[in-house]
Curated annotation (Swiss-Prot):
The gene is plsY. Keywords: Cell membrane, Lipid biosynthesis, Lipid metabolism, Membrane, Phospholipid biosynthesis, Phospholipid metabolism, Transferase, Transmembrane, Transmembrane helix. This is Glycerol-3-phosphate acyltransferase. It is an enzyme of class 2 (transferase). GO terms for biological process: phospholipid biosynthetic process. It comes from Mycoplasma pneumoniae (strain ATCC 29342 / M129 / Subtype 1). It catalyses: an acyl phosphate + sn-glycerol 3-phosphate = a 1-acyl-sn-glycero-3-phosphate + phosphate. It is a multi-pass membrane protein. SMART domains: G3P_acyltransf. It comes from the Bacteria.
Length: 239
């Protein structure tokens, strides 16, 4: 196999694995088990917040955790395929130019959650799945966003507002060099560290994340309307 074929397979596997894993809607899975249709109850959104409304705090938290894990594990599977199979067909220079393409699985997982194959392309808002993806990409991104999301939620009691603020801030954070600590990789064998400020990698994440941010704001348009009218449900009103 030549390098071009290996790179093509990396892209295809990353996108397919990510999308198929992202398409698993755990709110619907638990709904089948508990005989409750989350799409007909509460806000009718198959996500973690509405799952708390419909199933209770414990199951809702479990739904959110599973949604986050699929974003993380999609990357892990892509990473394993790259590391144990496709990487051997690349020289050092080629490796340093394409290793980040494994993160396409994270992008595909969020798309799968929003447009799930198994549920007629009607999904959720991809907040938890994006969180799991951030954990796979950069610990700094993940920690900053988690702390920010928790602070806004605790202060305002609005989960939707916390999600929107976090996505907006992350859209800025990804432009900051050295914060994208790609800790799964060590592309520089001399420094043995994954901090980098390569413009094309930053551009790669921008081209993925900025359209996703626009999509998330669009998916929250009803929440934004309720926030402006002060009729949005607070976390104290979930149960």
């Amino acid at each position: 196999m030549n390098a071009a074929s290996a790179i093509a397979l990396l892209i295809v596997f990353s996108l397919v694995i990510g999308y198929l894993m992202g398409s698993v809607m755990f709110a619907d899975v638990f709904g089948k088990i508990l005989n409750k249709d989350v799409r007909k109850l509460g806000s009718k959104n198959p996500g973690a917040t509405n799952s708390i409304r419909v199933f209770g705090l414990k199951i809702g938290f479990l739904v959110g955790l599973c949604d986050a894990l699929k974003g993380f594990l999609a990357f892990v599977f892509s990473f394993l395929i790259f590391s144990f199979w496709l990487q051997q067909y690349l020289n050092v220079n080629q490796y340093q130019k394409v290793y980040y393409l494994t993160y396409l699985s994270c992008f595909a997982a969020t798309i799968g959650h929003i447009f799930p194959l198994y549920f007629k392309f009607k999904g959720g808002k991809a907040i938890a799945t994006t969180g799991g993806s951030l954990l796979a990409i950069s610990l700094w991104w993940f920690v900053i966003c988690l702390v920010l999301w928790l602070l806004v939620t605790l202060i305002t009691k609005y989960v939707s507002l916390a999600s929107l603020v976090t996505f907006f801030i992350l859209a800025i954070i990804i432009l900051v060099p050295w914060l994208d600590y790609l800790y799964f990789f060590k592309p520089n064998p001399i420094n043995a560290i994954s901090y980098q400020n390569d413009w094309y990698i930053i551009l790669f994440f921008v081209l993925w994340y900025w359209p996703l941010t626009i999509a998330v704001f669009w998916l929250h348009r009803k929440n934004i309307h309720r926030l402006l009218n002060k009729t949005e449900n607070k976390v104290t009103q979930l149960n």
